[in-house]
Amino acid sequence: IVRTVQVTREADLTTLVEQSKARLVAMFAHGATTVEIKSGYGLTTESEIAMLNAAALLDSEHPADIALTFLGAHAIPLEFTDNPDDYVDLVVNEMLPAVADWRDEHWPDTLFCDVFCETGAFDLAQTRRILEAAARHGMALKVHVDEFESLGGARLAAELGAVSVDHIVATPDEDIEA
């Protein structure tokens, strides 16, 4: 993720669009008519918005239906390794409001917010904080949880009404039933 974040932060909008367009054209040629595009490799407000702009341009130029997900809580950026809660503050207080404003101007469809809740990424309290803020901004919720160990993320997703939960490899049965 670290290398991809660096490359994404350095890329201009044209580069983001062209690289993504090639992938989208290939998927469409193989029969995919709906594609989810996620941000999450910029991890700054500016680069996350750039990724959303690239997706919106692709949506306007290509016949595929695009579902768009803001994944600013994909990983803790290197510059926040010593204090991940500062990054959560950035996501909640700066990124989510900026993304909501962007959505209101550029994206008429549902905008999703996803969080990677896992040891080494975002803990349960951080995930709750981000998802609750996203919901306040009118975003539909998604969560990647319990890939390696159960932190209770699946239960949190159910509690908050997430539309999807991914990974769930280590999710206990009682949390799946929630």
What are these model-derived regions, one by one?
Residues 2-19, 25, 33-151:
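Metal-coordinating catalytic core of metallo-dependent amide/deamination hydrolases
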Residues 140-141, 150-178:
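Active-site-adjacent C-terminal substructures of enzyme catalytic domains
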Residues 1-5, 10, 160-162, 177-178:
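Short intrinsically disordered, low-complexity coil segments enriched in acidic
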